[in-house]
Amino acid sequence: MTPESVMALGYEAMKVALALAAPPLMAALLSGLLISLLQAATQINEMTLSFIPKILTVFFTLVIAGPWMLNLMLDYMRTLFGQLPNIIG
């Protein structure tokens, strides 16, 4: 196994991990920003107020993007297992 192939596998793994983490993280970021703007506009300084909308937003994002995320992960694992003989030998 050459250093280039190790770097390619690592690069692909990082790319897949970023693609899997991005939808829920972006949903939490946007909902937190929106709730913070509403709290600033209404001068409500309750720290726990933003948790429930964030949790619900992440949950619904995972429900909507879940099949795509699962297909992405399965495609990567199929590719990785298909390359396993080349990696070992």
Swiss-Prot record:
Q: Which InterPro entries match?
A: Bac_export_3, FliQ
Q: Which residues form the signal peptide?
A: none
Membrane topology summary: Multi-pass membrane protein
Gene Ontology biological process terms from the UniProt entry: bacterial-type flagellum assembly; protein secretion
Write down a Pfam family by its short name: Bac_export_3
Where in or outside the cell it occurs: the entry states: Cell membrane; Bacterial flagellum basal body
Q: Which residues form a coiled coil?
A: none
Question: What cellular component terms from Gene Ontology apply here?
Answer: bacterial-type flagellum basal body; plasma membrane
Source domain of life is Bacteria
Q: What role is this protein assigned?
A: Role in flagellar biosynthesis.
Identification of the protein by name: Flagellar biosynthetic protein FliQ
